[in-house]
C-alpha cells in the first residue's frame, strides 16, 4: 500500500488496487523475503526501511542492540556500511537460492510425490520405533491403590476377606457332594447286594435303614447348602458394594491428581500434549483404572478364593490325589503371567494411539468452523483414522497372546480331570480312598478350575488398569522444571516492579535449532510503560512468556527488583502480573465468573460477594465492557459459552482486559491486548489501559502503533535482538529507521471531505433496518400480512420451531432402543469381521458345551465307583480319564478361537465406532456445536469413552456371555435328557435368577445414563483447563480448577453410592439363590433315588447339568454393568450417526456449481437472525447487502454488531430465520453445500492450524485431492501470503511440524499460513475476518498487497478494525446493532462524518 500521507478519493476497485500494487510489489516482496530469511534463518537482524516517497529504493540496515545512551540515534553512515556488508555476505544466499532452479522444492510432480511418500514412510517407521521404545511398563497391582485413604484400605481388605469367603462357598459345596456321594454309593452297594441275595426280613430292615440314613443325610446336607447360600448372599452383597464405592473413590482421586499434575507442568510440556489427550486420559484411561480397581478386583479374589479353597480342600481330603493334581499350577501361573504381560504391553501401546487420536479430535472439534469452511472433514477424519488403525493393529497382536494363553491354561486344567479319575481309580482300588473322597477332590478341582474361566475377563480388566495407570501415574509423578504447585521460592513483602533481562538467550524446547532471543539485555524500570514492536516471530511474545516464567532462559537471567525470578515463588510471581494475550481465552462460566478469576491470589480473593462484584463492575467499566454486558440476557450472570464463543472477539478481549486489571496488579503485560477491538472500543479501552498503567510497570506488545505512541520507551525488535529503542518522537526522528517505517505503513490521513452523501433519512424506529437494496414491496406486503394474522414475526416463528426441535432432540436422548436391535446393528457395522464373529461364536458355544459334557462324563465315572472288582474299576475309570483328556484337547482348540476371535473383533469394532462417530460428529451443523452439552470437552470425552464401553461388552466379555448361555442351555438340555422331572424342577427356579438379573440391568442402565452425563461434564472442565493452560497458569487458577473439577466429580460418586446398594443386592441374590436351587434338586433327587426312580449316574448327570446351568445363569448377570454401559453408549453413538443436520455438507442434494461458470455475485436480502443458544438477542435485523462480482467490500463497526455473523451466514454455518442469502442469484439453500463452500475461502480472526506439517496445513485448503496439488501451487500460495521464504528457511522446510494448534509458530506466522491455505483453492469468493489482525505492520503491508492481488477477479468481503487495510474497498458497510448504518466508499463515508468518520479519526497516526 502507498506510504503517502493522504488517501485518494476515487473508488478503489480491484483494477485500481492492482495498478497501485504493481508499482511496489517487487520491492515489497524483496523486503519481506529478506526480512524473514535473515531474521529467522541467519538470526541476524535485517529490517527494511523505505523512504516516504513512493518508489524509493529499499535500504537494508543492521543496527544490532542499542544501548540506552543512544536511544533511537543511528547514523546514516552506519546504515550504509552495514548495507554494503550484508550485500556481499553469504547471508544473501538463502534468498537467491529460494528462487533458483536447483531449489529442493522445484521438482517435478512425480519426483516430489515419490520423495515425499518415501520420507513419510521413513518418518512413520521411526515414529513407530520411538513409540514402542516409549511404552511404559504396567504399574504393579498395589500401585493402583496408592491414593486410597487408610479407612478405605481397611474397607477394601474387609471386602477381599468377604470375597474370598464367598469364593469358598462353592468348594464347601463339594464337601457336601462328597459326603452324599459316599451315602449314595453305600446305598447302591447295599441295594445291589440285597437284590442279588433276595429280600428277607433282615435285608429288608437293612435296606430301610439305608434309605432312612440317606434321607436324613440328604435333608441335613440340603440345609447346609441353604446356609451356604445365605452366607454367599450376604458376603457378596457387602464385598461388591464396598469395592464398587471404593473403586469410584479411587478413580475420583486419580482423576483429580492427574489433572492437578497436568496443570502444574511447565508450558513446554504441552507442546506434545493436547487438551484432547488430557480428556482422553481422564475418560478412557481413568475409566479403565476404575474398572480394574472396583468390583472386578473383588471378583478376581472371589474366583481366586474358589480356586485356592478348592485345592486346599482337595489336599485335606486326599493329599496324594491333590498332590498329583497340583502339578498343573506352575503351568497355569506361567501361562497366565506371560499372557497378562503381553496384554498389558499391547494394551498400553493401543491406548497411546487412541490418546493421540483424541488430541487430534480435540483440535478439530475445537475449530469446527474452519474444518467445515474448507470442507476437510474427510481428510482430517482420515488422519484420525490412521491413529485408530495403529491402535487396532497393536490390539490385534495382544489378542493372539490372549487366545494362546487361555487355551493352554484350560487345556492343563481339563487334562487334570483325566489325571484325577485315572489316579483316583488307582487309590480307590487300593483302598486308599473311597468314592466320596475322590468326588470331593474332583469337584473341588472342577469348581476351582471352573472359576478360572470366570476370572480371565476380570483379571484382564485389572491388567488393562495397570497398563492405563502407567501413563497416568507417569504424569502424576513427573516433577516439572517449572512447578506451579511448588511452595518453594521467596515471597517479597513489597514489589517495585523493575524487570531486567541480562544476556538472555532462548529457543523453544521443541525447536532447539531456531534461536528466538540472542543475548537480549534491557531493563524495564518500575512504574513506566514500555512497548515492544517488530516483525512476527521477532521474540516479542517470548519476552512476555519469560517474564511470566512460562519458560526459563537457555542462558542469562531474568530479574524482578534485582532478584532472579527463578528464586521467587512461582504463584506469587504470576499473581503480581496481569496478562492479556493476543488470543484471549474465557472459560465456560458467567461474565462475572470470568472477571473474578483475576482476583485469585490477590488481597480480594476472600472478599465478600458484594465487594467482589463491585470490583468486577469497576474493571468492566474501565475496560469499556460494562455497556455491552448489561445488554446481555442475564447481564453479568450470562454464560459466555465454551471459550467465550457466545461473545464476539472484541467482547471477549474486553472481558479479558477487565480480568487482567481487576486485581490492580503491579505489572501489566499486554500482548496485543486491543487487537480484536474495533477502533471506537480500542480508543476507550486504550485510555483505560493508559490510566491503569500509571504507577505500575507495563509492557505492551502491539502491531497497532497508535496504542503505544505514549509509551516511555519503545523497543523495535528483530531477529531476537533490539534494533532500536527510544520514545515515539525520538524514533520518528530517524526517518529511515525501522520504527519510522512501521509508522509510515500505518498512516491513515484525512483529506477534505467531498459533499456528504445523505444517509437514508426516513428511519423513524431505530430498531428498523434501512439498508441498501431493501425488501421488495411484495415481500414487505407478505410480511405485513403474515404479522397481521399471527401477531408475530417470521423470525420469531422460525426460532420457536428451532427451540421445539431442540427440546424434542434432548427428550429423545433418554430413550434407549432395544438391546437386541442395538447389538444386531453393532454386529452389522463390524461386518468385515463377520467370519471372525461366526467362528468365535461357534467356538464360544462349543466351549460352553464343555461343562454339560463334563456332567455326562462325571455321571458315568461316578457309576463306575459302584464296581466292586478293582481291576475292572481301574479299567472303567481309565476309560473315563481318556474321554476327559480328549475333551481337554477340544476345549483348548475352541477356547483359542473364542478368546482371540472376540478380542480381535472387539478392537476392530472399537476402531469402526470411533471412526464413524468422529465422522458423524464433523457432519453436525454449527448450531449443534453451539449447545453447551456438545462442547469440545464433552464431545471429545464421548468420543474417547463410548466406543471403549461398547468394546467392553463386545470383546472377550461377549465370548464369555455366549459361553455362559451355551452352558445354561446345554445343561438344561442334558438334564432333561437324563432326568426330565428332576431337571424341570431345577430349570423352573432359573427364571427367578434371570428376573433378578433383568431388574438389576434396568437399575444399572439408568445409573449409567446419568453417570455418563455427569462424567462428560467433568471431562469438559478438564479439557477446557488443559486447552487454556497458559491462561490458567497466568491467573494461578490451578487450585481453583482443581476445586471445581473435584466438585463436579462428587455428583457421580454420590449417585453411584445410592444405586450400588440396590444393584449389588440383586447380584448377590442371584449368587445365593443358586445354592438354594442346588439344595432343592439335591434333596428331591435323593428321595427319588430312594424310590428307585433315578440311578446314581442319572442323578449326578442331571445335578451337575443343573448346577452348571444355574451357576451360569447367575454369572451371566455379572456382566450387567458391561451390558448397561454398552447399551447406553451404543444408543448415544447411533443417535449421533443417525442425526441428519439441517445443514449437511455430506448431502448430495442441491445444485452442484461449475467453478468455471461461477461469477461470485453475493447478496444478502432481508436477513433476520438470532443464535439458537441465545434466542433473546437479535443479531441481524433485516440485513440487506449487495456485493457485485469481483468487487472488494469491507464490513466495519463496533464489536458485536453482527459482522462476523454475516460471514457465518455467507459460509452457511447457519440459515437465516427470515430472508435469504444468494450466490449469482441462487438461494444458497438450493445449492449443494460442499459445492458452494468450495467456491469460498475463509481466513478467520483467530487462525487455526492442526498438529502436522506446514505442508499438511496448507493443503487443507485445496479443492482437489492433496496428491494432485503440485509444489508450484503450494509455493505460489505461500509467496502471495508472504510466508514462503520463512518456510524454506526452516531446517525441515514445508515438512516442519507446527505443533498442536500451531503452537510452534508465532501469531503472524500462523495467520500467514492460514492465508496461504485460503489462497491455494483459488476461490471465487474470499472472506477475510480480520485476516491481518495478528500481523506486524511490515507483514501486514505485504500480505495486504497480496490479498489485494488475490482479490483481482474474485469477490472479496473483509471485516477489519484496521481501516488502513480496507480504505480502498469498492464499498464499505458500517454496521451498528445488526444493521447497516452507513455505506459507501472511504471518501464518501468520511464526508458523512458519521460512525465511520469517528473510527478513522481515532486511527489517524499523522497527528502526533
From Swiss-Prot:
Residue stretches spanning the membrane: 147-167, 223-243, 296-316, 321-341, 408-428, 436-456, 838-858, 882-902, 952-972, 981-999, 1072-1092, 1099-1119
Single biological process term from Gene Ontology: oligopeptide export from mitochondrion
Catalyzed reaction equations: itraconazole(in) + ATP + H2O = itraconazole(out) + ADP + phosphate + H(+); voriconazole(in) + ATP + H2O = voriconazole(out) + ADP + phosphate + H(+); fluconazole(in) + ATP + H2O = fluconazole(out) + ADP + phosphate + H(+)
Location of region: Disordered: 79-102
Domain of life: Eukaryota
Disruption phenotype: Causes higher susceptibility to itraconazole (ITC) and rhodamine 6G (R-6G). Causes further increase in susceptibility toward fluconazole and itraconazole, when AFR1 and MDR1 are also deleted.
Keyword terms of this UniProt record: ATP-binding, Cell membrane, Glycoprotein, Membrane, Nucleotide-binding, Repeat, Transmembrane, Transmembrane helix, Transport
Gene Ontology cellular component terms for the protein in this record: mitochondrial inner membrane; plasma membrane
Function of the molecule: Pleiotropic ABC efflux transporter that confers resistance to structurally and functionally unrelated compounds including azoles such as fluconazole (FLC), itraconazole (ITC), posaconazole (POS), and voriconazole (VRC).
Protein name: ABC multidrug transporter MDR1
Species for this entry: Cryptococcus neoformans var. grubii serotype A (strain H99 / ATCC 208821 / CBS 10515 / FGSC 9487)
Amino acid at each position: 500500500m502507498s506510504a503517502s500521507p493522504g488517501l485518494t478519493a476515487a473508488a478503489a476497485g480491484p483494477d485500481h488496487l492492482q495498478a497501485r500494487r504493481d508499482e511496489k510489489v517487487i520491492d515489497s516482496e524483496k523486503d519481506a523475503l529478506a526480512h524473514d530469511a535473515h531474521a529467522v534463518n541467519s538470526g541476524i537482524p535485517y529490517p527494511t526501511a523505505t523512504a516516504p516517497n513512493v518508489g524509493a529504493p529499499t535500504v537494508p540496515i543492521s543496527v544490532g542492540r542499542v544501548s540506552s545512551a543512544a536511544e533511537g540515534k543511528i547514523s546514516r553512515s552506519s546504515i550504509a556500511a552495514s548495507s554494503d556488508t550484508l550485500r556481499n555476505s553469504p547471508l544473501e544466499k538463502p534468498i537467491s537460492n529460494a528462487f533458483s532452479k536447483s531449489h529442493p522444492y522445484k521438482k517435478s510432480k512425480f519426483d516430489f510425490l515419490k520423495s515425499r511418500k518415501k520420507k513419510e514412510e521413513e518418518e512413520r517407521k521411526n515414529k513407530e520405533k520411538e513409540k514402542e521404545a516409549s511404552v511404559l511398563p504396567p504399574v504393579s497391582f498395589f500401585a493402583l491403590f496408592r491414593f486410597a485413604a487408610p479407612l478405605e484400605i481397611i474397607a477394601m481388605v474387609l471386602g477381599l476377606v468377604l470375597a474370598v469367603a464367598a469364593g469358598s462357598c462353592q468348594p464347601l459345596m463339594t464337601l457336601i457332594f462328597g459326603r452324599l456321594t459316599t451315602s449314595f454309593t453305600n446305598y447302591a452297594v447295599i441295594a445291589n447286594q440285597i437284590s442279588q441275595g433276595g429280600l428277607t426280613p433282615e435285608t429288608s430292615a437293612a435296606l430301610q435303614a439305608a434309605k432312612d440314613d440317606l434321607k436324613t443325610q440328604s435333608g441335613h446336607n440340603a440345609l447346609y447348602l441353604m446356609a451356604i447360600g445365605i452366607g454367599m448372599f450376604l458376603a457378596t452383597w457387602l464385598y461388591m458394594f464396598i469395592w464398587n464405592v471404593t473403586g469410584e473413590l479411587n478413580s475420583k482421586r486419580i482423576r483429580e491428581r492427574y489433572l492437578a499434575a497436568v496443570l502444574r507442568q511447565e508450558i513446554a510440556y504441552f507442546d506434545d500434549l493436547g487438551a484432547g489427550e488430557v480428556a482422553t486420559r481422564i475418560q478412557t484411561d481413568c475409566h479403565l483404572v476404575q474398572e480394574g480397581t472396583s468390583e472386578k478386583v473383588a471378583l478376581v479374589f472371589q474366583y481366586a478364593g474358589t480356586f485356592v479353597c478348592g485345592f486346599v480342600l482337595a489336599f485335606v481330603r486326599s493329599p496324594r490325589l491333590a498332590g498329583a493334581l497340583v502339578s498343573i499350577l506352575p503351568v497355569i501361573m506361567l501361562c497366565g503371567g506371560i499372557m497378562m504381560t503381553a496384554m498389558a504391553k499391547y494394551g498400553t501401546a493401543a491406548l497411546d494411539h487412541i490418546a493421540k487420536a483424541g488430541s487430534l479430535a480435540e483440535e478439530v472439534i475445537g475449530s469446527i468452523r474452519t474444518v467445515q469452511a474448507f470442507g476437510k472433514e474427510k481428510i482430517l477424519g482420515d488422519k484420525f483414522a490412521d491413529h485408530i488403525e495403529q491402535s487396532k493393529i497393536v490390539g490385534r497382536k495382544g489378542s493372539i497372546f490372549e487366545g494362546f494363553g487361555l487355551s493352554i491354561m484350560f487345556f492343563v486344567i481339563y487334562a487334570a480331570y483325566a489325571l484325577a479319575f485315572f489316579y483316583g481309580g488307582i487309590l480307590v482300588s487300593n483302598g486308599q480312598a473311597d468314592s466320596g473322597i475322590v468326588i470331593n477332590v474332583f469337584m473341588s478341582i472342577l469348581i476351582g478350575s471352573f472359576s478360572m474361566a470366570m476370572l480371565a475377563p476380570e483379571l484382564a480388566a485389572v491388567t488393562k488398569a495397570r497398563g492405563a495407570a502407567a501413563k497416568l501415574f507417569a504424569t502424576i509423578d513427573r516433577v516439572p522444571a517449572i512447578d506451579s504447585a511448588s511452595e518453594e521460592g521467596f515471597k517479597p513483602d513489597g514489589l517495585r516492579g523493575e524487570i531486567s533481562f541480562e544476556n538472555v538467550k532462548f529457543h523453544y524446547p521443541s525447536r532447539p535449532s531456531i534461536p528466538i532471543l540472542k543475548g537480549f539485555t534491557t531493563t524495564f524500570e518500575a512504574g513506566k510503560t514500555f512497548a515492544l514492536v517488530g516483525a512476527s516471530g521477532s521474540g516479542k511474545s517470548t519476552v512476555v512468556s519469560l517474564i511470566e516464567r512460562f519458560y526459563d532462559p537457555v542462558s542469562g537471567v531474568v530479574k524482578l527488583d534485582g532478584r532472579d525470578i527463578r528464586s521467587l515463588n512461582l504463584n506469587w510471581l504470576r499473581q503480581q502480573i496481569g496478562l492479556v494475550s493476543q488470543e484471549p481465552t474465557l472459560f465456560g462460566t458467567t461474565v462475572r465468573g470470568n472477571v473474578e478469576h483475576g482476583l485469585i491470589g490477590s488481597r480480594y480473593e476472600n472478599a465478600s460477594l458484594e465487594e467482589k462484584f463491585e470490583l468486577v463492575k469497576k474493571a468492566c467499566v474501565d475496560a469499556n465492557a460494562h455497556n455491552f454486558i448489561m445488554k446481555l440476557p442475564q447481564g453479568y450472570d450470562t454464560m459466555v459459552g465454551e471459550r467465550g464463543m457466545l461473545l464476539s472477539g472484541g467482547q471477549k478481549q474486553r472481558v479479558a482486559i477487565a480480568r487482567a486489571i481487576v486485581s490492580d496488579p503491579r505489572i501489566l503485560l499486554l500482548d496485543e491486548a486491543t487487537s480484536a477491538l474495533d477502533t471506537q472500543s480500542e480508543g476507550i479501552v486504550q485510555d483505560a489501559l493508559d490510566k491503569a498503567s500509571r504507577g505500575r510497570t507495563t509492557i505492551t506488545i502491539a502491531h497497532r502503533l497508535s496504542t503505544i505512541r505514549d509509551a516511555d520507551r519503545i523497543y523495535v525488535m528483530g531477529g531476537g535482538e533490539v534494533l532500536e529503542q527510544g520514545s515515539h518522537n525520538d524514533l520518528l526522528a530517524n526517518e529511515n529507521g525501522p520504527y519510522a517505517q512501521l509508522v509510515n505503513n500505518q498512516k491513515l490521513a484525512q483529506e477534505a471531505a467531498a459533499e456528504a452523501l445523505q444517509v437514508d433519512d426516513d428511519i423513524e424506529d431505530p430498531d428498523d433496518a434501512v439498508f441498501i437494496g431493501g425488501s421488495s414491496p411484495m415481500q414487505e406486503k407478505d410480511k405485513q400480512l403474515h404479522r397481521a394474522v399471527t401477531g408475530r414475526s417470521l423470525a420469531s416463528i422460525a426460532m420457536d420451531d428451532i427451540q421445539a426441535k431442540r427440546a424434542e432432540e434432548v427428550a429423545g436422548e433418554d430413550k434407549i432402543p432395544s438391546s437386541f436391535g442395538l447389538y444386531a446393528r453393532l454386529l452389522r457395522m463390524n461386518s468385515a469381521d463377520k467370519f471372525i464373529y461366526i467362528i468365535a461364536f461357534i467356538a464360544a458355544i462349543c466351549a460352553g458345551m464343555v461343562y454339560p459334557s463334563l456332567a455326562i462324563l462325571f455321571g458315568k465315572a461316578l457309576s463306575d465307583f459302584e464296581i466292586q472288582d478293582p481291576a475292572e474299576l481301574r479299567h472303567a475309570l481309565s476309560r473315563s480319564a481318556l474321554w476327559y483328556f480328549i475333551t481337554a484337547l477340544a476345549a483348548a482348540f475352541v477356547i483359542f478361537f473364542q478368546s482371540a476371535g472376540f478380542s480381535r473383533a472387539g478392537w476392530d469394532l472399537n476402531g469402526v465406532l470411533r471412526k464413524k462417530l468422529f465422522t458423524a460428529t464433523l457432519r453436525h451443523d454449527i448450531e449443534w456445536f453451539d449447545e453447551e452439552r456438545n462442547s469440545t470437552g464433552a464431545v471429545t470425552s464421548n468420543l474417547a469413552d463410548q466406543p471403549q464401553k461398547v468394546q467392553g461388552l463386545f470383546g472377550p466379555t461377549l465370548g464369555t456371555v455366549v459361553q455362559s448361555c451355551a452352558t445354561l442351555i446345554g445343561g438344561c438340555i442334558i438334564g432333561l435328557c437324563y432326568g426330565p422331572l428332576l431337571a424341570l424342577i431345577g430349570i423352573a427356579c432359573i427364571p427367578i435368577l434371570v428376573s433378578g438379573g433383568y431388574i438389576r440391568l434396568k437399575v444399572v442402565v439408568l445409573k449409567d445414563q446419568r453417570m455418563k452425563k455427569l462424567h462428560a461434564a467433568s471431562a469438559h472442565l478438564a479439557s477446557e483447563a488443559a486447552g487454556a493452560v497458559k491462561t490458567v497458569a497466568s491467573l494461578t487458577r490451578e487450585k481453583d480448577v482443581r476445586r471445581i473439577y473435584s466438585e463436579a466429580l462428587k455428583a457421580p460418586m454420590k449417585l453411584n453410592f445410592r444405586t450400588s446398594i440396590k444393584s449389588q443386592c440383586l447380584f448377590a441374590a442371584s449368587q445365593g439363590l443358586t445354592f438354594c436351587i442346588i439344595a432343592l434338586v439335591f434333596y428331591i433327587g435323593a428321595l427319588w433315588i430312594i424310590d428307585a426312580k433315578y440311578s446314581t449316574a442319572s442323578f449326578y448327570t442331571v445335578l451337575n447339568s443343573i448346577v452348571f446351568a444355574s451357576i451360569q445363569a447367575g454369572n451371566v448377570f455379572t456382566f450387567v454393568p458391561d451390558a448397561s454401559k454398552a447399551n447406553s453408549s451404543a444408543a448415544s453413538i447411533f443417535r449421533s450417526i443417525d442425526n441428519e443436520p439441517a445443514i449437511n455438507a455430506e448431502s448430495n442434494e442441491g445444485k452442484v456449481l461449475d467453478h468455471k461458470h461461477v461469477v461470485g455475485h453475493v447478496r444478502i436480502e432481508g436477513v433476520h437472525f438470532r443464535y439458537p443458544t441465545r434466542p433473546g438477542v437479535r443479531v441481524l435485523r433485516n440485513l440487506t447487502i449487495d456485493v457485485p462480482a469481483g468487487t472488494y467490500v469491507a464490513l466495519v463497526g463496533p464489536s458485536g454488531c453482527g459482522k462476523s455473523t454475516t460471514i457465518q451466514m455467507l459460509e452457511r454455518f447457519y440459515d437465516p430465520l427470515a430472508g435469504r442469502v444468494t450466490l449469482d442469484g441462487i438461494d444458497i439453500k438450493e445449492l449443494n453445500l460442499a459445492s458452494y463452500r468450495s467456491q469460498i475461502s475463509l481466513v478467520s480472526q483467530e487462525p487455526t492450524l492442526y498438529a502436522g506439517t506446514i505442508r499438511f496445513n496448507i493443503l487443507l485448503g485445496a479443492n482437489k485431492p492433496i496428491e494432485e496439488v503440485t509444489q508450484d501451487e503450494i509455493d505460489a500460495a505461500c509467496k502471495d501470503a508472504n510466508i514462503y521464504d520463512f518456510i524454506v528457511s526452516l531446517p525441515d522446510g514445508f515438512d516442519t511440524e507446527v505443533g498442536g494448534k500451531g503452537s510452534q509458530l508465532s501469531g503472524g506466522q500462523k495467520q500467514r499460513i492460514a492465508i496461504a491455505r485460503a489462497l491455494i483453492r483459488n476461490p471465487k469468493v474470499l472472506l477475510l475476518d480480520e485476516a491481518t489482525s495478528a500481523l506486524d505492520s511490515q507483514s501486514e503491508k505485504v500480505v495486504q498487497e497480496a490479498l489485494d492481488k488475490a482479490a483481482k477477479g474474485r469477490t472479496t468481503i473483509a471485516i477489519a478494525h484496521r481501516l488502513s487495510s480496507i480504505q480502498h474497498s469498492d464499498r464499505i458497510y458500517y454496521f451498528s446493532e445488526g444493521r447497516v448504518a452507513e455505506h459507501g466508499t472511504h471518501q464518501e463515508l468520511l464526508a458523512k462524518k458519521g460512525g465511520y468518520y469517528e473510527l478513522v479519526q481515532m486511527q489517524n497516526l499523522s497527528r502526533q
